[in-house]
C-alpha cells in the first residue's frame, strides 16, 4: 500500500466492476449446458425441448410478474401524483414502469414468446397442459407479490452500495460535489494568482497547491496545531472576493501553515481540513441521522475517491490540489505526512528534470 496504507488511513477501495454480471453469465451457461448435455446423452429429445420451453416460459412469467408487481407500486404513486409528479400521468408511469435495461428486457421477452409459440406449434399436446398454465399464472400473479411482501426482493448491502456508487447517490457523493462546486471550483483556478499576490509567502511556498486533510474518523479540529503542534498557522493568502449566493464580494481565503521539523527545516503549505466531513462525524453521533461507524468509514473513502475523480476531470483544478488521507486517530503525525509527500514530489520533479 502506498505510503504505509495512506498515512494510516487504510486502503481506499476501488469501484465495483462487472464481476457479478460475468459470474452470473458463467453460472447460467455452465448449468444450462450441463443440463442439455445430460439430456442429449440420454437421447431424450423431448427433455431437451422441454428445457427450452420451460426456460422461455419461466423467463416470460418473470417479466410479466415484475410488470404486475409494479402495478401495485402504481397504486401508491397515484396518491402522490400532484405533489411528486406535478399531476402528470406520463411521469407517474415512467417512474413506475421504466427499466434501466428496457431494450434488453424487451429482446429477452420477445425471444421467450417466440420459443413458447414454436414449442406449442411443434408439440401442442405435450406443452399445452393445465398444470403448466397454473404454474405460469402463479409465477406471474402470486409469487412476485409474495416475494415482495416477505422482503426477499429487498436489495442487500452490496446491491444497495452498487446502485448508489453507480448513480452518485451516496452521501459522500453529495458531499464531494458540494465541496467542489461550492468551494474548490471557485478557489483552485485562482490559487496561483493569490500566492503571487502575497509578498510574505510567494517565495516560501514551494508547492503551489492546496493540501486537504481527510481524517478517517471525519473529526476536524478547529486548529490543526491541536492535532500536531509542529504544524502552526503562519498567516493567510491574499483573500479573493467573489459574488456568490446573493452576497457581494464574499471572501474566500486559504491559510498557510508552517511545518517545523527537528532538523530546523521549515516547510510552508496551503493547508486545511475537508471541513464538510465534520457533518459525517456529527451524523454518526446523532440519533436522528443513523450512520454507523462502518458506514461512516465507507463514506469517507467514497468521498476521497469521488473528489479525486471530480478534480482530475476539471482542467482548471487538475494538479492544484492534494488530498491527504490520514488516520485521524493519532496526533503528531500530520507534519511527518506532509513532509513525506513534499519530499516524494520533489524527487519526482527532479527525476523529470533529468
UniProtKB/Swiss-Prot annotation:
This is Stimulator of interferon genes protein 3. It holds the Pfam family STING_TM. Belongs to the STING family. Keywords: Immunity, Innate immunity, Membrane, Transmembrane, Transmembrane helix. One of its GO terms (cellular component) is endoplasmic reticulum membrane. The keyword Transmembrane applies. InterPro entries: STING (IPR029158), STING_C_sf (IPR038623), STING_LBD (IPR055432), STING_TM (IPR055434). It comes from the Eukaryota. Facilitator of innate immune signaling that acts as a sensor of second messenger signals produced by cyclic GMP-AMP synthase-like receptors (cGLRs) and promotes the production of type I interferon. Innate immune response is triggered in response to nucleotides from viruses and bacteria delivered to the cytoplasm. Acts by binding cyclic dinucleotides: recognizes and binds cyclic 3'-3' linked cGAMP (3'-3'-cGAMP), cyclic di-AMP (3',3'-c-di-AMP) and cyclic di-GMP (3',3'-c-di-GMP) second messengers produced by cGLRs in response to nucleotides in the cytosol, such as double-stranded RNA (dsRNA). GO terms for molecular function: 2',3'-cyclic GMP-AMP binding; 3',3'-cyclic GMP-AMP binding; cyclic-di-AMP binding; cyclic-di-GMP binding. It is found in: Membrane. The chain crosses the membrane at residues 20-40, 48-68, 101-121, 132-152. Its main location: membrane. It is a multi-pass membrane protein. GO terms for biological process: activation of innate immune response; autophagosome assembly; innate immune response; positive regulation of macroautophagy; positive regulation of type I interferon production; reticulophagy. The gene is STING3. 3',3'-cGAMP binds at residues 178, 183, 250-251, 253, 272, 275-276.
Amino acid at each position: 500500500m502506498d505510503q504505509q496504507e495512506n498515512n494510516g488511513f487504510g486502503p481506499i477501495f476501488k469501484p465495483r466492476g462487472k464481476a457479478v454480471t460475468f459470474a452470473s453469465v458463467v453460472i447460467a451457461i455452465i448449468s444450462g449446458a450441463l443440463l442439455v448435455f445430460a439430456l442429449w446423452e440420454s437421447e431424450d429429445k423431448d427433455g431437451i425441448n422441454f428445457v427450452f420451453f420451460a426456460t422461455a416460459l419461466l423467463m416470460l412469467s418473470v417479466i410479466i410478474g415484475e410488470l404486475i408487481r409494479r402495478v401495485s407500486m402504481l397504486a401508491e404513486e397515484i396518491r402522490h401524483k400532484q405533489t411528486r409528479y406535478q399531476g402528470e400521468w406520463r411521469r407517474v408511469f415512467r417512474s413506475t414502469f421504466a427499466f434501466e435495461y428496457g431494450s434488453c428486457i424487451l429482446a429477452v421477452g420477445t425471444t421467450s414468446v417466440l420459443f413458447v409459440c414454436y414449442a406449442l406449434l411443434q408439440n401442442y399436446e405435450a406443452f399445452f397442459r393445465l398444470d403448466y398454465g397454473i404454474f405460469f399464472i402463479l409465477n406471474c400473479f402470486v409469487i412476485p407479490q409474495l416475494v415482495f411482501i416477505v422482503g426477499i426482493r429487498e436489495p442487500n448491502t452490496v446491491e444497495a452500495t452498487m446502485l448508489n456508487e453507480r448513480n452518485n447517490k451516496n452521501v459522500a457523493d453529495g458531499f464531494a460535489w458540494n465541496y467542489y462546486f461550492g468551494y474548490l471550483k471557485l478557489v483552485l483556478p485562482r490559487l496561483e494568482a493569490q500566492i503571487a499576490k502575497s509578498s510574505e509567502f510567494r517565495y516560501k511556498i514551494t508547492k503551489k497547491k492546496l493540501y486537504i486533510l481527510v481524517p478517517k474518523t471525519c473529526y476536524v479540529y478547529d486548529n490543526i496545531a491541536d492535532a500536531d503542534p509542529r504544524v502552526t498557522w503562519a498567516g493567510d493568502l491574499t483573500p479573493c472576493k467573489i459574488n456568490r449566493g446573493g452576497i457581494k464580494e464574499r471572501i474566500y481565503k486559504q491559510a498557510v501553515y508552517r511545518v517545523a521539523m527537528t532538523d530546523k527545516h521549515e516547510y510552508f503549505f496551503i493547508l486545511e481540513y475537508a471541513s464538510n466531513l465534520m457533518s459525517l462525524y456529527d451524523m454518526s453521533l446523532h440519533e436522528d441521522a443513523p450512520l454507523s461507524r462502518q458506514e461512516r468509514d465507507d463514506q469517507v473513502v467514497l468521498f476521497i475517491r469521488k473528489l479525486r475523480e471530480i478534480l482530475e476531470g476539471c482542467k482548471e483544478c487538475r494538479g492544484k490540489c492534494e488530498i491527504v488521507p490520514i488516520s485521524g486517530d493519532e496526533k503528531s503525525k500530520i507534519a511527518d505526512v506532509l513532509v513525506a509527500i513534499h519530499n516524494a514530489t520533489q524527487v519526482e520533479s527532479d527525476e523529470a528534470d533529468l
